[in-house]
């Protein structure tokens, strides 16, 4: 049976990710769930600190710890928070000896990936900080927006040589297994045009790509809006990849 690795969006609670687990566990798949801490996603990554490499490596090591490294693996990646982690997983799958032999069946992207969209990133961060003290919330939002604007937008022509963005890395990623993109024109955080651009670029590299526009569902809410259709898309994709 396949192993499915779910990489949650920034601020995602495990109980939400568990609903996606059920799609696969009901079919007998082994499911691993992980969401990176928001501090790593919004600050470490923005500053070019590769702190997400550690959980990325640990997730792949789990396959060996549980002796399931010979099973096909499907990645289900949510928003840019999941994509940032997936980027390091991809790097290790192609550069670290024990991981090179893993059999990746495919990758599903839900509401991702997005480019350097500062407005969308600030909206996402504001959602994560919703329950926080108002003064601290606005201080963190200001600090993040300022850092991101300087390092990831204004200075990116220079900083990309040190730390390429996750989006630019994925455009030329060496992986060639099938990819499914689930996105929406109504997404206020990740632009549909950026997801479509990525899907088209990957297809031009010879990757088997399918892209589905849900049109009206908000960011990471496609399954909530269309549960039966969403589950069917995921299971059909997994079946086609095996």
Feature names for model-found ranges:
Residues 104-117:
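Active-site nucleophile loop of the alpha/beta-hydrolase fold
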Residues 73-79, 107, 181:
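Conserved alpha/beta-hydrolase fold motif
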Residues 141-235, 240:
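Serine-hydrolase catalytic core
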Residues 18, 53, 192-196:
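Short, surface-exposed alpha-helical segments at coil->helix boundaries
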Residues 39-67:
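Catalytic nucleophile-loop/oxyanion-hole region of alpha/beta-hydrolase
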């Amino acid at each position: 049976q396949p192993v499915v690795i779910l990489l949650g969006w920034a601020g995602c609670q495990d109980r939400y990710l568990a609903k996606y687990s059920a799609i696969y566990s009901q079919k007998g798949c082994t499911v691993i769930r992980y969401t990176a801490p928001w501090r790593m996603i919004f600050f470490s990554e923005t500053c070019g600190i590769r702190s997400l490499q550690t959980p990325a490596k640990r997730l792949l090591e789990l396959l060996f710890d549980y002796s399931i490294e010979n099973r096909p693996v499907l990645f289900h990646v949510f928003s840019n928070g999941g994509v940032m982690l997936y980027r390091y997983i991809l790097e290790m799958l192609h550069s670290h000896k024990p991981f090179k032999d893993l059999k990746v069946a495919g990758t599903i992207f839900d509401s991702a990936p997005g480019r350097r969209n500062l407005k969308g990133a600030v909206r996402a961060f504001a959602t994560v900080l919703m329950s926080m003290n108002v003064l601290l919330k606005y201080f963190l939002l200001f600090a993040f927006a300022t850092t991101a604007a300087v390092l990831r937008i204004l200075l990116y022509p220079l900083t990309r040589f040190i730390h390429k963005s996750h989006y630019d890395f994925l455009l030329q990623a060496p992986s060639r297994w099938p990819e499914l993109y689930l996105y929406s024109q109504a997404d206020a955080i990740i632009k549909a045009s950026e997801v479509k651009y990525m899907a088209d670029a990957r297809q031009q590299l010879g990757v088997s790509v399918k892209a589905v526009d849900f049109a009206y569902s908000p960011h990471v809410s496609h399954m909530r809006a269309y549960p039966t259709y969403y589950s069917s898309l995921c299971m059909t994709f997994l079946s086609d990849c095996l």
